[in-house]
Amino acid sequence: MLASIFSKTRPFNYLVVGILSLFFFSVKIIALAQPNADWIYYVEQFGLYLLLFASLFVLNFITLKNGLTKGNNYALFLFFVFLLFFSSIFQNKNIIISNFLLLLALRRLISLKSLLQTKEKIFDASFWIFLAALFHFWSIFYIVLVFIAIILHVSKDYRNWIIPFIALFAVTIIFFLANSVLDNSLLSTLLSK
């Protein structure tokens, strides 16, 4: 039955995954909600659901654009199933945000094989990875993929090796700028993890 539903890319697949993910996410949020939860809590949780749903579409875009699944939606379905198996992800908003940013980085790294605008793609991927590391520290290890992509595709130009460090500098500047605007609350939040 699942093979017949997800064997081809159809709008019905997105509808099934969207409704099921909304149902399971809603059940999880209602089960975890405090009795005195206000509307801000539910708006924040709905925003996280939209980010999770956007992650599904970014993953589907990556797989279809690069021919990774040969025109079917099994990657979309498997991502949804893994979300259900590891339902503790729903409780940690930092992991959801970090996952979305890492998918954006992987999209840029995979598109590096076209050898068009390589410097921009390396910067974007590094930027998203360093930004994801602010939300979930262990995401920093994905920077190894940037250097592997540089080795595989554009290692001859020495400037490509400097670009990830420029992205690190940019994320650091943005972090400290946002931290100063928010009266050092970001730094204390980051250090308390």
Regions from the language model: what does each represent?
Residues L103, F141-H153:
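Hydrophobic transmembrane alpha-helices of multi-pass, membrane-embedded glycosylation machinery
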Residues M1-L20, T69:
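N-terminal membrane topogenic signal
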